[in-house]
UniProtKB/Swiss-Prot annotation:
InterPro entries: Myo-inos-1-P_Synthase (IPR002587), Myo-inos-1-P_Synthase_GAPDH (IPR013021), NAD(P)-bd_dom_sf (IPR036291). It catalyses: D-glucose 6-phosphate = 1D-myo-inositol 3-phosphate. Key enzyme in myo-inositol biosynthesis pathway that catalyzes the conversion of glucose 6-phosphate to 1-myo-inositol 1-phosphate in a NAD-dependent manner. Its EC number is 5.5.1.4. Keywords: Cytoplasm, Inositol biosynthesis, Isomerase, Lipid biosynthesis, Lipid metabolism, NAD, Nucleus, Phospholipid biosynthesis, Phospholipid metabolism. It is found in: Cytoplasm, Cytosol; Nucleus. Its main location: cytoplasm. Belongs to the myo-inositol 1-phosphate synthase family. It comes from Hordeum vulgare (Barley). One of its GO terms (biological process) is inositol biosynthetic process. This is Inositol-3-phosphate synthase. One of its GO terms (cellular component) is cytosol. Pathway: Polyol metabolism; myo-inositol biosynthesis; myo-inositol from D-glucose 6-phosphate: step 1/2.
Length: 510
């Protein structure tokens, strides 16, 4: 059964004017390694910590600024939001299609809230806490190409022609601001697009981004802004002492116009200095140590890295299943070919390396979770190949072969073919990242014994479900298994309204 909304009634939950407060008991464990008389043992002790959550329920007018607004992802997202807002329908070869937000966790998925008369009851994910309606978002952004959003949509070749014709009047007046362009960080083949760039030194470019954010906020009268990088994958930046290892060194390097400070890092610095959340949707190491340090000092949300949309999402499910079932993956070979601008940029070895790292690390935590299957240091052979094939356009082909060891020396091979409509999968993920980042800034919490409420850690692990290479605070375990990531996100939101985590025990029927 499906219900549109619900209200929690509990002595530990209070709905006030503009806020929800909850008292929540967090049940976990602590491990102790004890030694007695030369013998050692592990002891697991149940542990409970009481938390107080406070969520601001006033939904702001939210502005979204995309770096790479005129790219395939940006133009597709813009088109989708307009089509939903205006209730547009269009003819395909199969049917008359209605606009929707399929593929969005916040807009098109559900959560279980309990059971009624023996039937499980589900409600929209977005009903847990008040969120910004995507139809109300105000968009803007930067691009190194001056092409307006209507022409960018046509260039992308993602959406049906009938839909494009209906959207053109809404989008042809939308033009991106000049963007930061450094040909050393992306493929040389992107130079032909770069006719709309911010001139000057790196410091001047960063200051222009700050100015752009302020003017966008003032012009559109928005309460908050979230900035998201959906531009080209950059090569990895060098990280070294004295260059970008601390906030002081990073800012000094910007002042000195150091060549190794990437455009994405400049955007991120500008956002952090303005107190604006910044999300990195590409695989490069935007968040160098000095930038993470700056975000923590300024208590400004940062999140990333790299949208998790197609092949990697499948991998994070399948490997989790195999290892959890006691099956040992020994070889994972992933092949992709695509023909959009992302594929053209990734045809350069230095930018492909960033993507290869992001895609390859996704199974690490699952492998390390099972020492029965894997010896220390042992890891599946894992190869990732990406090729540029212009004809297939945005319709990326992903082919995977998983070879595993099974019972008594047997071998199992699974082969998958996945046609990933790249931008149509990524656009709703961008939407979720923006909405959840904004929501995160309205949640405060404190553990028992702490003096005052505080925000989540600025490094937003809550966004991990949506990214290939989750950015986590120093010393925090990295979790890539998709089911764990979704459970973490959902259960934190449940805690904000005093609901227990969804553990699927269903003891009332046992």
């Amino acid at each position: 059964m499906f219900i549109e909304s619900f209200r929690v009634e509990s002595p530990k939950v209070r709905y006030g004017a503009g806020e929800i407060e909850s008292e929540y008991r967090y049940d976990t464990t602590e491990l102790v390694h004890e030694s007695h008389d030369g013998a050692s043992k592990w002891v697991v002790r149940p542990k409970s910590v009481n938390y107080h959550f406070k969520t601001n329920t006033t939904v702001p007018k939210l502005g979204v600024m995309l770096v790479g607004w005129g790219g395939n992802n940006g133009s597709t997202l813009m088109a989708g939001v307009i089509a939903n807002r205006e209730g547009i329908s269009w003819a395909t070869k199969d049917k008359v299609q209605q606009a929707n937000y399929f593929g969005s966790l916040t807009q098109a998925s559900t959560i279980r809230v309990g059971s009624y008369n023996g039937e499980e009851i589900y409600a929209p994910f977005k009903s847990l806490l008040p969120m910004v309606n995507p139809d109300d978002l105000v968009f803007g952004g930067w691009d190194i190409s001056s092409m307006n959003l209507a022409d960018a949509m046509t260039r992308a070749k993602v959406l049906d022609i009938d839909l494009q014709k209906q959207l053109r009047p809404y989008m042809e007046s939308m033009c991106p601001l000049p963007g930061i362009y450094d040909p050393d960080f992306i493929a040389a083949n992107q130079g032909s697009r770069a006719n709309n760039v911010i001139k000057g030194t790196k410091k001047e470019q960063m200051e222009q981004v700050i100015k752009d954010i302020r003017e966008f906020k003032e012009k559109n009268k928005v309460d908050k802004v979230v900035v998201l990088w959906t531009a080209n994958t950059e090569r990895y930046s060098n990280v070294s002492v004295g260059l970008n290892d601390t906030t002081e060194n990073l800012l000094a390097s910007v002042d000195k116009n150091e060549a190794e400070i990437s455009p994405s890092t400049l955007y991120a610095i500008a956002c952090v200095m303005e107190g604006v959340p910044f999300i990195n949707g590409s695989p490069q190491n935007t968040f160098v140590p000095g930038l993470i340090d700056l975000a923590i000092k300024n208590d400004c949300l940062i999140g990333g890295d790299d949208f998790k949309s197609g092949q990697t999402k499948m991998k994070s499910v399948l490997v989790d299943f195999l290892v959890g079932a006691g099956i040992k993956p020994t070889s994972i070979v992933s092949y992709n070919h695509l023909g959009n601008n992302d594929g053209m940029n990734l045809s350069a070895p230095q930018t492909f390396r960033s993507k290869e790292i992001s895609k390859s690390n996704v199974v690490d935590d699952m492998v390390s979770s099972n020492a029965i299957l894997y010896e220390p240091g042992e890891h599946p052979d894992h190869v990732v190949v990406i090729k540029y094939v212009p004809y297939v356009g945005d319709s990326k082909r992903a082919m995977d072969e998983y070879t595993s060891e099974i019972f008594m020396g047997g071998k199992s091979t699974i082969v998958l073919h996945n046609t990933c409509e790249d931008s149509l999968l990524r656009a709703p993920i961008i939407l979720d990242l923006v909405l959840l980042a904004e929501l995160s800034t309205r949640i405060q919490l404190k553990a028992e014994g702490e003096d005052k409420l505080h925000s989540f850690h600025p490094v937003a692990t809550i966004l991990s479900y949506l990214t290939k290479a989750p950015l986590v605070p120093p010393g925090t375990p990295v979790v890539n298994a998709l089911a764990k990531q979704r459970a973490m996100l959902e259960n934190i939101m449940r805690a904000c309204v005093g609901l227990a985590p969804e553990n699927n025990m269903i003891l009332e029927y046992k």
